[in-house]
Amino acid sequence: MSTGTVVQVIGAVVDVEFPQDAVPQVYDALKITGEGACNGLVLEVQQQLGGGVVRTIAMGSSDGLRRGLEVVNSGSPISVPVGTATLGRIMNVLGEPIDEAGPIGEEERYVIHRAAPSYEDQSNTTELLETGIKVIDLVCPFAKGGKVGLFGGAGVGKTVNMMELINNIAKAHSGLSVFAGVGERTREGNDFYYEMKDSGVLDKVAMVYGQMNEPPGNRLRVALSGLTMAEKFRDEGRDVLLFVDNIYRYTLAGTEVSALLGRMPSAVGYQPTLAEEMGVLQERITSTKTGSITSVQAVYVPADDLTDPSPATTFAHLDATVVLSRQIASLGIYPAVDPLDSTSRQLDPLVVGQEHYDVANGVQTVLQRYKELKDIIAILGMDELSDDDKTTVFRARKIERFLSQPFFVAEVFTGSPGKYVSLKDTIRGFKGILNGEFDHLPEQAFYMVGSIDEVIEKANKKK
């Protein structure tokens, strides 16, 4: 273990000088020693500048750092605890417990920088994962071992949707989950912990947080820390769920670090290594012949612009994309999933079956036609439409409302009990609407219900 000294501090970036024959490698973890608030602060090597000097990023607050402090090279990258000891615990980017429940007591640690599984180790799966959320199961079904992105601007419900998915899948799937909170609000991390505790699945979830108020180094690496824990469970032959909230903050932390390291920015001010950084993370989130990682990632869309380089780069890596729309949210329809923008590779007759495919296609066709007719209705009114178009509009409005659903995790602030709808009931309900079986029912009856049977019951009560 070689020792060096701090020679320059620029915010979260720290330059350290080592003897010429003992220069640390890129990604090695260094530790500040000596007195003061910074004792034990971990630095990660990012660049070798020559002359024995390395440029590092601080994995904590650099307040109180000064030139001349002694730094020790650990000789390996940052490592985190893995295995069952992490379940039910909240950790930071370094794998240190932050829940005041004592030491983790792990038997094994993994380094966070690891190679992605090779081609021959990867497995291809087409098994569907039922979520119990109608709009998702119908239009953009998830694959077990697949990657899903929840895209949306500020305040359209990404975190609530993710919490509902965790609630539904973690309970039904009864597998293990890892939750990586990347640059999100501490309040949400706190809410998530108590949500898991109240629903009795805390002992199946490992939580790693690098929140909004932490330095960019933490936010950049916390996703890798969470992923490393998930990889351990996968390599033991288990099926793991990896939840990342929010992938955009991971990109943003990379942008901050890149600027601090003096790299020239690329489009919209993002780091020039955006695609590579995203690829390094996403390529590791994959299923092998041993076990699977099913990942759900929230992706913040800046200014609701899906062409922004960050969400656009993320799109390429996903099997299913769930796009949340502000326009749909403004109508009071939750979950505010846009059935025309959301896509899934699984929506194929060979995977989901012909009936499911036809119903999903029919729903999208009717909604698309309604979208086209809206301008005519706004200018000329409903009376100018043909009988066929009128029927399409009435059915589309019922479909729109039937796509809404009360959530378990939202019970506290909506007052209505959550509903889990099986895929079979979802297909039956939408097929009935498309075939005109429920044309006689008022459209209000379709709003915020579970299965089609509840619609009939609600309509009968209103008579």
Swiss-Prot record:
EC assignment: 7.1.2.2
Keyword Cell inner membrane: yes
GO CC aspect terms: plasma membrane; proton-transporting ATP synthase complex
Chief location: membrane
Keywords: ATP synthesis, ATP-binding, Cell inner membrane, Cell membrane, CF(1), Hydrogen ion transport, Ion transport, Membrane, Nucleotide-binding, Translocase, Transport
Listed Gene3D superfamilies: 2.40.10.170, Bovine Mitochondrial F1-atpase, Atp Synthase Beta Chain, Chain D, domain 3 (1.10.1140.10), P-loop containing nucleotide triphosphate hydrolases (3.40.50.300)
PROSITE patterns: ATPASE_ALPHA_BETA
Pfam family, one: ATP-synt_VA_C
Places the protein is found: Cell inner membrane
Coiled coil spans: none
Catalytic activity entry: ATP + H2O + 4 H(+)(in) = ADP + phosphate + 5 H(+)(out)
GO terms, molecular function: ATP binding; ATP hydrolysis activity; proton-transporting ATP synthase activity, rotational mechanism
Quaternary structure note: F-type ATPases have 2 components, CF(1) - the catalytic core - and CF(0) - the membrane proton channel. CF(1) has five subunits: alpha(3), beta(3), gamma(1), delta(1), epsilon(1). CF(0) has three main subunits: a(1), b(2) and c(9-12). The alpha and beta chains form an alternating ring which encloses part of the gamma chain. CF(1) is attached to CF(0) by a central stalk formed by the gamma and epsilon chains, while a peripheral stalk is formed by the delta and b chains.
Entry's family note: Belongs to the ATPase alpha/beta chains family.
Name of the protein this chain belongs to: ATP synthase subunit beta
Gene (name only): atpD
